[in-house]
């Protein structure tokens, strides 16, 4: 069923491997994004963005010998340059720098067996820990992780920090930066569409779809773009901002620019009109905003 629903070939995945994968509507729009892990023979876990994906799967499960259930998991993120050292301590040495990007498995963390992947929502070196619903002693896990991280200066942070880092890193938010009215190509995610695989939902529409992107980055030295801000070309509105934040890394205001039509937008200086009516010069750039070779998240900058 996952080969039918997701845009990448799932049946050939190795155990412990993770893929970023999209689910599309029949018309080729982006319905859901997430990471699918192969837990074992015929066992998979799709870590989805917000939305009714389980209902979608159940509706499409007719004719498949499949069991679909929500594990009621909550995800903890250990992200940053010291994350390998922290997880090494938390796992009693079982997790180290040899664990590749987008690999996963079960590990003992303070006496609890939990699923861990070398992924994250920050485009930073890091790990995600998947709690097992009511079976996990969350308080004990929290105390164990904080004790492992204390010698490395680990701190608890909010989703605001996560949002800033994910936008800096070019990670899109489903229904915020992309939605069912956009194809993966328009969202700049064409690399995750395998048109060579057998039929999947949306494939026929995507074969004939325009391959040009409508989504880019925007930088502004004078202001921070916010959701709903307009992008003007010679006083004509040509796009809008889906999400924006101040970037500590770049020292600029940054945001995702969604254009109404394809065009040669990159490297163009345009006008950003904020909701308060003020207008500021801005530049359109390719995503991500930095580390375009993804060396940090792969640990290749160490």
Where would I find each of the regions flagged by the language model?
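Extended, compositionally biased flexible segments
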Residues: 1-43, 47-63
